[in-house]
C-alpha cells in the first residue's frame, strides 16, 4: 500500500510539473515588461488592444535585414500594409510565416506585407527597448534571416531600432499585426495572435472601399 501511495504521489507531481511547463510555453511569446509610466506616476502606456482605427504609429528610422535604411515612408509605397510584429523566439510567429509569405505573393500590387523583428536590434546596439524588454541582440539578425529563408519569407523585415521600438511600444506579446494605410495609420484594431485569414479580409475590405 505504501508503494502504491508513493507512485500515486509521483504521478500527481508529474502532472503538476507538466501543467506548469505548458503554461510557461504558452506564455513564452509575451513581453513581461511593465507598462511605461512617467516621472509623476501617470500611466503613459497604451495597450495594443486599446488602439483604434486611425491611430498613427509615428516616425521611425531603422534598417532591414540586409542593412538598408527603412523609415515610415515605406508605408506610402502601397495603399495598405500588413505589418507583422514578431520575434525569433516565438513559435506561433514562425508557424504563421509560411502563410504570410504566401499571402504576400497573392496580394495585389497596391498592398504589401512588412515584418518587424522586435527582438533584433541593429548591429552595435547595446541597450534600449529591444534589448531590455525583449532580450534582443544583434545576433538575432542572422537568426531572423535563417527563419525567413526556412519559411519562404521574401518581404521586407525591419530591425528593432529604438525609434521602431518606440513606435510599437504598445506591443506586449507577439505576433501582433497592424493593418495600415499609406500614412501609417491603423485601419482597424490590431490582431493579437496569428490570424492570416483575418489580415487578408481586412485588406480586401479596405481596398474595396477605396
Q: Residue spans of the language-model regions?
A:
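Short, Lys/Arg-enriched N-terminal segments with co-localized hydrophobic residues
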Residues: 1-9
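N-proximal helix/coil linker or "cap" segments that precede and/or mark the start of modular domains
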Residues: 30-59, 76, 139-146
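C-terminal motif of bacterial Sec signal peptides marking the signal peptidase cleavage site
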Residues: 24-28
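Short pre-active-site segment immediately N-terminal to redox-active cysteine/selenocysteine motifs
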Residues: 79-81, 86-89, 120, 173
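A short beta-strand-turn-helix
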Residues: 59-81, 105
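Thiol-/selenol-based redox modules, centered on thioredoxin-like
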Residues: 176, 181-210
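Short, internal strand/loop/helix patches
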Residues: 133-182
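Conserved redox-active cysteine motifs that mediate thiol-disulfide chemistry
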Residues: 85-102
